[in-house]
From Swiss-Prot:
Secretion signal span: none
HAMAP family recorded: Fen
Residues covered by region (N-domain): 1-104
GO molecular function, one term: 5'-flap endonuclease activity
GO terms classed as biological process: base-excision repair; DNA replication, removal of RNA primer
Binding residues annotated for DNA, in chain numbering: R47, R70, E158, G229, D231
Cofactor note: Binds 2 magnesium ions per subunit. They probably participate in the reaction catalyzed by the enzyme. May bind an additional third magnesium ion after substrate binding.
Enzyme class: hydrolase
GO (cellular component) term, any one: nucleolus
Enzyme Commission (EC) number: 3.1.-.-
Location(s), subcellular: Nucleus, Nucleolus; Nucleus, Nucleoplasm; Mitochondrion
Stated name of the protein: Flap endonuclease 1
The protein's required cofactors: Mg(2+)
Organism: Monosiga brevicollis
């Protein structure tokens, strides 16, 4: 789920923190990509003729196709992608996972009803809701990335948190995901729509809260996100995005908010673990950036052909030509960014770490 309506809050209250950009503007950037989110997008992608990509055994292969071609597209534009896979979900996410399971059961029942009625539009709708990324999908994608020479890491828990750690530690320029909670975990640059197909014509959205925005401390921002609704605890019914923003701007933290809420109007969730959720965002279980080492290597063309064509039924001529493009792009992507030759000069001093003002001391914003 990420953070409910956070993108709308930022668009409304801090529009300067969002800009639209093109993939060509990310030349020579290292980007940490939320692998599970990308794989999910590839799995639900339906071909124009309405059928999923499958191999001879009838197993879906759209995730392999999407990962292969979108990654090559990024490399062709000089981007150095690093995929980050989810590890074990945090214990606090168990409630959200149970809700997702219940929604899938409901979708299955609705799909069966739509199938009986021959309603193709509803069938497609509920089929998408049944899609989830499996261990096998992840293993296949990691095998493909290895053959492509593209690095990946497996996070201890949440991929978004690990991506944010890599950004904060100066290992990569940005986090690429559709989940806005990457900002709540502290990434300074968030890219949305990064792995969307060109056919969707969706510009990449770049979020940089430190470049103009909400004027909240990180702790205040996290508490606002919890009020908006996150994966780790319930939210207060009746508090929408405007109210959540207003309450935190006025009271600074959830503890003080609760002292001023009308109990007749707002019902606080029973056993509401907002403090634990806050701690999870502030200090997530991640591998320290300094301990993360990865490199981009030469693609194994013959290995790619064997895996993609012989094992998964893709056309050899297309795979081989694309793999050769990948090799060429890797060799040609050596020129650095112009701004990598300059050092950002900090302006003034900050009294506290604020979202929308200055980040904590760390690496300069232009590293790659």
């Amino acid at each position: 789920m990420g953070i409910h309506d956070l993108s709308k809050v930022i668009a409304d209250k801090a529009p300067d923190a969002i800009k639209e950009t093109e993939i060509k503007n990310l030349f020579d950037r290292k980007v940490a990509i939320d692998a599970s989110m990308s794989i999910y997008q590839f799995l639900i992608a339906i071909r124009s003729e309405g059928s999923n990509l499958v191999n001879e055994a009838g197993e879906a292969t759209s995730h392999l196709s999407g990962l292969f071609y979108r990654t090559i597209r990024m490399v062709n534009h000089g981007i150095k992608p690093l995929y980050v896979f989810d590890g074990k979900p945090p214990t606090m996410k168990s409630g959200e996972l149970l809700k997702r399971g219940a929604r899938r059961k409901e979708a299955q029942a609705n799909l069966e009803e739509a199938t009986e009625q021959g309603d193709t539009e509803q069938m497609e709708k509920f089929s998408r809701r049944l899609v989830h990324v499996t261990r096998e999908h992840n293993e296949q994608c990691r095998q493909l990335l290895t053959l492509m020479g593209i690095p990946f890491i497996i996070a201890p828990t949440e991929a978004e948190a690990q991506c944010a750690e890599l950004v904060k530690g100066g290992k990569v320029f940005a986090t690429a995901t559709e989940d806005m909670d990457a900002l709540t975990f502290g990434t300074t640059v968030l890219l949305r729509h990064m792995t969307f197909s060109e056919a969707r014509k969706m510009p990449i959205q770049e979020f940089r809260l430190q470049k103009g925005g909400l004027e909240m401390s990180m702790e205040e921002f996290i508490d606002m996100c919890i009020l908006l609704g996150c994966d780790y605890c319930d939210s207060i019914k009746g508090i929408g995005r405007q109210k959540a923003y207003q309450l935190i701007k006025e009271h600074k933290n959830i503890e003080t908010v609760l002292k001023h809420l009308d109990p007749k109007k707002y019902v606080i969730p029973e056993d509401w673990h907002f403090a634990e959720a806050r701690e999870l965002f502030l200090r997530p279980d991640v591998t320290p950036a300094a301990e993360c080492e990865f490199k981009w290597t030469t693609p194994d063309i013959d290995g790619l052909v064997k895996f993609m064509c012989q094992e998964n039924g893709f056309a050899e001529d297309r795979i081989r030509k694309s793999a050769e493009k990948l090799v060429k792009a890797r060799k040609g992507g050596q020129q650095g960014r112009l701004d990598s030759f300059f050092t950002a000069i900090p302006s003034g001093s900050a009294k506290r770490n604020t979202v929308g003002l200055l980040p904590k001391p760390g690496p300069p914003p232009f590293l790659f």
